[in-house]
Amino acid sequence: MKWKTLLFLLLPPLMAWGQKDKDKGKAIQSLGTKQAHYTDVAKQIWGFAEMGYLEEKSSALLQGELSKAGFEIEKGVAGIPTAFIATYGSGKPIIGILGEFDALPGLSQEAFVPERKAILEGAPGHGCGHNLFGTGSLAAAVEVKNWLAQNKVPGTIRFYGTPAEEAGDAKVFMVRAGLFNGVDAVVSWHAADRNSAGPSTNLATKSGVFRFYGVAAHAAAAPERGRSALDGVEAMDMMVNMMR
């Protein structure tokens, strides 16, 4: 994990407090000295490779790192055992940093191997870089915390440990529980093939379940009495495509 990648997550919270360029340079240098440690954290989460809502080891590792750095930990928020909030400081602004750490099914893979080579065939793996996601957010939160403490600046940095991003919608439950109320800004990042600030937007999704019920009838004697559930599915598919 290149530590410079963390800079793009680190700068928005620091700019919220009006940090000077020389202080940004110090933050970058500080991250460089901790590169090996954060790389080890990312490797551990890679090895855990835990599915959504089951990230017990990954969540505990991140909580432990934040606790050692001086954050207060609130565990099991929104009724989710692996969700947590780590907070440092007081007053405004309140800056949130998202950290994800869940894996995907069937993507077990040995690290640093360019070809497909599962650690355990059929087991989960980090196909979307969430081992880096959680670790990078951890590093940024700790560095901002250190800056607040060293400069005696009022403000709050809040790390949101958000499990089950891939399919479990844990953030939705966290929002509904009011855990983001009063936050002035929330920043996030994602592992990619380049280092850049991403101003682009993404479409949101809202899931739902649709059931179609048919009516049975004799195909030869009374076909007019039958109703095909498949007809409804096909009609909906066609009309949704037309709406797009």
Question: What do the PLM-derived regions correspond to, one by one?
Answer:
Residues 9-11, 133, 137:
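Enrichment for repetitive, rod-forming helical segments
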Residues 1-20:
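Bacterial Sec-dependent N-terminal signal peptides
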Residues 3, 23, 43, 93, ...:
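Short, functionally important structural connectors and interaction interfaces within domains
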Residues 117-125, 131-132, 148-244:
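Histidine/acidic-residue-rich, glycine-tolerant segments that coordinate divalent metal ions
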Residues 20-126, 135-155:
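Acidic/His- and Gly-rich active-site-bordering loop/insert found
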